[in-house]
Amino acid sequence: MDKPAKRIVMIVGPTAVGKSDLGVYLAQQLHGEVINGDAYQIYRHMDIGTAKITPKEMQGVPHHLLDIADPTVAYSVAKFKKAATAMIDTVADRQQLPILVGGTGFYLNSLRLNLPLGGKAPPTAIRQRWQVALATNGQSWLWQQLAQRDPDAAQQIAPANTRRVIRALEVGELTGRRFSDQPQPAPLFSTLVIGLTTDRAVLYDRINARVDAMMQAGLLAEVEQLLKTVPADAQAMQAIGYKELVPYLHGQAELADCVALIKQHSRHFAKRQLTYFRNQMPTHWFDLVAHPEDKNAIVTLVQQWLKQR
């Protein structure tokens, strides 16, 4: 099979390792434009808690798919894939290198692998049966059902992504074939994946410091303002850094406890991100925290890859 003609670079990794800065640097060095690959940075008015890059930090580099959705509206991986595919085509048609930057693994992998999404809806009865089973038994039980029927699909889908777990179970029932055995379309793009990481203790210290900086920058006020128009149970409000502050704003928790939870959840999320990228994507890893000079090696790696045919 011939390789796809269009090429994209993905910069992945856990929170707080410098993905946004590297995206700008690569774009400057390689005639690129940055496309957001973070599930929550697509929302307007969610800037501090998502660590959204600022116009000053962009240094004139075009950035796309930021602030494209209202936080009252649910977004999906299918919507992201469609929007990102169109934007990649636009950037590539300008003879610029599309550089996707983000930490939402499933969003990025759906694009890299051209995963089939948003297909024919299954019969309501099947969906309702699994939803009732989820409500009765919990998400861990639901995921175990998928793991027993389709271990490969279970490895690709987090237990917390219950909508996707149910979808995989439905497809298995509808077709009589495992979700992971469904015909897969060919990739639309040739992809080079650059991963950033660092020593775990250093990473956790950086995460804790970032949360403190977010609080000082006005995260609490940002969440309070959002709650004036966005329900607390909205998809956007489930983002780490937002959901933890809601109890304080409702007079149900102490602020220090909520901030501690943000740090804890952020550390746990970083661990899950690393696990996903290591297991699910062919990633070239670098530690720019310990070795900032390696960014030039990354430029060289990308240049050599772009020359390959």
From Swiss-Prot:
The keyword Repeat does not apply. It catalyses: adenosine(37) in tRNA + dimethylallyl diphosphate = N(6)-dimethylallyladenosine(37) in tRNA + diphosphate. It comes from Lacticaseibacillus casei (strain BL23) (Lactobacillus casei). Monomer. Its cofactor is Mg(2+). This is tRNA dimethylallyltransferase. Catalyzes the transfer of a dimethylallyl group onto the adenine at position 37 in tRNAs that read codons beginning with uridine, leading to the formation of N6-(dimethylallyl)adenosine (i(6)A). Belongs to the IPP transferase family. Substrate binds at residues 15-20. One of its GO terms (biological process) is tRNA modification. ATP binds at residues 13-20. Its EC number is 2.5.1.75. One of its GO terms (molecular function) is tRNA dimethylallyltransferase activity. Pfam families: IPPT. HAMAP family: IPP_trans. It comes from the Bacteria. The record marks 104, 127 as: Interaction with substrate tRNA. Keywords: ATP-binding, Magnesium, Nucleotide-binding, Transferase, tRNA processing. InterPro entries: Dimethylallyltransferase, IPT, P-loop_NTPase.
